[in-house]
Amino acid sequence: MAKVLELAVLFPGPLAGRLLLEQGFEVVKVEPPGGDPMRQISPTLYKVLNEGKRVVHVDLKGDAEEVRRLAEEADAVLTTFRPSTAERYGVSYRKLAEARPDLIYVAIVGYGGDEYPRDHPSHDINFAALAGAVGPCPPYVQAVDVAAGLLAALTITAMAARGARGYVEIPMSRAAALVNILNLSLRRDGKPLVLSGDYPFYTVYRCRGGRVALGAVEPKFWERFCRAVGREDLIPRRLDPAAREEVEKVLAGMDCGALEELARREEIPLTPVYDIDRALAIFPPEALLNGVNPRSERTR
C-alpha cells in the first residue's frame, strides 16, 4: 500500500487526501498543534475529509525534523503550503528529496504562471475572480477548491501507477480557469456566453411557491419546453435574451409543483431549486465521498 504524507489543512488538500484514501492509499495527515482550522469551521466537513487518516500534530516552526522523518517513510507528499512557506519550514521538495530522491511531491499552490504574484495569499473566490468566473454576486459553491483537490488526487494516483517521481504543481488559478473553460473558449471563438443566465433557455425562474432551473441547452428541449407551457411562438427566440422576460411572465403564474410534474412527464430539463436544508436531506455530507473507490463493498 502506497503511503501519502498530507501537509494540508482546510479544503483542497484534505479533499485530495480523502480521495486517495478511498483509492487504497494510506494517508498520514500532519496538523498544527491547534489542529486543522476546519475542525472549528465545520466539524462535519472535517470528519468527511479526514476520517480514516492517521493524524499527527507537529509544530513545523520548531520540529520540522519530525515531518522530514515521516516524508522518508512516504511514497508521496501532498501539500498546500505556499512555496515560500514550505521552504521556510524546511519541507519543500528540494529539502525532502535530499533524503528521498524517488519521492512524489504534489503541491497545490495559488498561482503557477505570470497571472499574479506567485505567493499572494488567496482563496477560492480570488482564483475564480481572476478566471472571469465571478459575476456581481459571489459564487455560492467552492468549485475551485474541489477542482484543485480532484486534480491533485488524480496526479498522485497517475504518478504512482506508472512509477513516475518528482515535483508537480497544481495551481489553484489554473483549476479556476479549468472550471470556467467553456466560457473562456466561447469568448475565444467570438460566441456569446450562452450559459451565463442571460438567455431564456438556461436560467432560473420564479414560479408560485419557489423557483425552477431550466437547462434546455439542446434546441429539442427548448422546443419541448415552449410547447409544454403553450408558447410555441418563443421557439425561434431561444438565443434572444429579451425572450427571458416572456418566459418569466408565463412561469410566474404557474405552480412550481405542477411545473416539476410537467417537466418529468415531458422529459424537459427543468428542476426545482432547493434551499440548503432540502439539499442536505438528500445529500448528507457524510455519504458523499463513500464509494468513490470502485472496489469498495459500499458500491455493490
What spans do the regions from the language model cover?
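Glycine-rich beta-alpha junction loops
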Residues: 34, 110-112, 172-179, 209, ...
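Nucleotide donor/acceptor-binding cores
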Residues: 2, 166, 210
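Aromatic-enriched alpha-helical interface/lid elements that frame and gate functional surfaces
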Residues: 200-272, 276-278
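Active-site-adjacent capping/gating segments
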Residues: 39-46, 191-192, 198, 274-300
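N-terminal helix-loop segment corresponding to the beta1-alpha1 unit
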Residues: 1-162, 296-300
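Glycine-/small-residue-rich "gating" segment that lines the acyl/pantetheine channel
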Residues: 130-140, 189-200
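Active-site-adjacent beta-strand anchor residues
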Residues: 6, 79, 171, 214-216
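Substrate-binding/catalytic subdomain of NAD(P)-dependent oxidoreductase enzymes
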Residues: 141, 147, 159-192
